């Protein structure tokens, strides 16, 4: 409450704050983004039957403040079924076919349930909607389209859509890391290294959209270590492996990888700094 009172202003209409949608086993953030449900009651109304959001109905301009120090942790019930989401989203889009927000959520839900072609079709339509201008959400649509193309066996199109996602929002790690994970599966080591190098240059999380936990944990350096190893760049592989282990020091696979890379470096005369 004190954090809210410290930043609230008389003309403020909404308060934004950090939201941890998921937490890792050690309590650190998994999926994290900025949330928005603190508001002046008279100026907003709830909209949509699922993934509800606040629709502004005031006469003046919105004024949002960010509440530093306020964090909401979400503890999802792993036993809870998502079966109700899809029909509600289909109903929402049927009622408002031009609603870009619901169209995006519907396409994403098709991905979650493995209906890949419907995901592709729906999210391509999302990208064509005149109100679908938010770069981060457009980027997310492109990422899910890419993922869906991979699952139906068209990796050429998956690559194309990941490149489009990066071009849409080059300052977020997520499209680079997800693309790198696909390239890893295909043993495309030079592409993995290129993407990881670019991703690690991004030092700040987005304050405007979802940040996936795997973009900010050991994953980038882990992928970098493996790619460099197979490219014969052993000293650089060692550096990435050491960094990966600092994020997850108890991970046995990362420990074994580091030992393997160290041994290779010793074998060819590279000393560890």
Regions found by a protein language model. Give the residues of each.
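Catalytic-site signature of metal-activated, phosphate-bearing donor transferases
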Residues: 1-121, 125
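"A position-specific structural signal for the A-helix of alpha-solenoid helical repeats
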Residues: 105, 144, 178-181, 185, ...
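TPR-repeat structural position
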Residues: 82, 116-117, 155, 189, ...
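Structural signature of alpha-solenoid helical repeat junctions
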Residues: 98, 137, 171, 209-216, ...
């Amino acid at each position: 409450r004190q954090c809210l009172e410290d930043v609230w202003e008389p003309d403020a209409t909404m308060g934004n704050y950090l939201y941890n949608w998921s937490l890792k086993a050690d309590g650190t953030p998994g999926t994290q983004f900025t949330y928005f449900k603190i508001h002046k009651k008279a100026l907003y109304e709830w909209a949509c039957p699922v993934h509800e959001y606040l629709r502004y109905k005031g006469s003046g301009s919105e004024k949002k403040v960010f509440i530093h120090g306020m964090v909401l942790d979400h503890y999802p019930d792993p036993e809870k079924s998502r079966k109700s989401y899809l029909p509600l989203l289909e109903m929402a889009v049927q009622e408002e076919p031009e609603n870009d927000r619901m169209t995006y959520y519907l396409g994403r839900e098709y991905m979650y349930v493995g209906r890949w072609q419907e995901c592709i079709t729906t999210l391509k339509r999302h990208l064509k909607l005149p109100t679908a201008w938010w770069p981060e959400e457009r980027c997310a649509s492109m990422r899910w389209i890419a993922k869906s193309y991979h699952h139906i066996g068209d990796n050429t199109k998956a690559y194309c859509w990941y490149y489009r996602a990066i071009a849409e929002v080059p300052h977020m790690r997520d499209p680079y890391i997800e693309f790198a994970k696909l390239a890893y599966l295909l043993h495309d080591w030079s592409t993995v290294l290129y993407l990881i190098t670019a991703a690690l240059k991004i030092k700040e999380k987005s304050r405007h959209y979802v940040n996936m936990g795997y973009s900010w944990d050991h994953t980038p350096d882990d992928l970098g270590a493996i790619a460099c190893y197979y490219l014969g760049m052993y000293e650089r592989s060692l550096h990435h492996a050491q960094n990966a282990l600092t994020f997850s020091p108890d991970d046995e696979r990362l420990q074994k990888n580091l030992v393997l890379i160290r041994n290779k470096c010793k074998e060819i005369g590279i000393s560890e700094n």
